[in-house]
């Protein structure tokens, strides 16, 4: 595991615990690594409600309840898709915060033409705004 990410996960986990908040995570190109780092922190069960790798539309439907209507005019690896998934994972798990990641890892990028390393991250919180 990456020590820098572990340190960041400890800080995030500490803030969540301190405020009595919870988080749910929907990942795509990171393949569960964000969740793994969050869960590597002792006491993560106090704030981590769950995570899922949403690598296909089928997974989005099954785990998050993403509908064809939700996806109209949208594709994966975009800010709007990350925002949708952040809101969905928050709603499905009933967490205070929803975090979603989508992108293209590599070495060649994705089928949409996004270069390797392209990433969109969104956070959905207690308010009505999602930020990417």
Regions found by a protein language model. Name each.
Residues 1-132:
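Short alpha-helical segments enriched in small residues
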């Amino acid at each position: 595991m990456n020590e820098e990410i572990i340190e960041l996960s400890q800080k995030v986990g500490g803030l969540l615990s301190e405020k009595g908040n919870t988080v749910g995570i929907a990942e795509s190109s990171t393949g569960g690594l964000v969740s793994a780092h969050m869960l590597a922190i002792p006491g993560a069960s106090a704030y981590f409600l769950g995570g899922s790798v949403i690598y296909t539309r089928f997974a989005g439907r099954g785990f998050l309840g993403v509908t064809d209507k939700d996806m109209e005019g949208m594709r994966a690896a975009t800010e709007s898709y990350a925002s949708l998934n952040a809101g969905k994972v928050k709603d499905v798990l009933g967490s205070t915060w929803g975090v979603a990641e989508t992108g293209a890892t590599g070495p060649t990028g994705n089928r949409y033409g996004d270069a390797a390393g392209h990433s969109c991250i969104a956070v959905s919180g207690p308010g009505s705004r999602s930020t990417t």
